[in-house]
């Protein structure tokens, strides 16, 4: 059964704050095989003009996944999480994320469409610091596979 189009525009406000730490950044950089000194060495980051180590551009996937899960688990939407796959992801950064950031995320369902028996959800998230300043906007396409015939 197709997802309800009336969910287009639904917003999911922040429910917690994500604390960005040096170790989290280092682990993520190591996981993606990026040895950039700006991700590992506080002195190198400061010399480049940053307050602390910065995160790789895709680091925000870590907190964005929690937002996607919040939508997927919304009982009113009725999405079958076991049938969902991540289609694509894009980031529009206002500034680099750095150790010491406290981030909050507001998620919105931008579009829902059905095609070839599958549902496609376009989800955006605004990631802000605790002062409300925009840090990054993300966009994800989620695909909910239809039932096999």
What are the functions of these language-model segments?
Residues 1-7, 88, 93-149:
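HotDog/MaoC-like acyl-thioester-processing domains
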Residues 1-86:
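Hot-dog-fold acyl-thioester-processing enzymes
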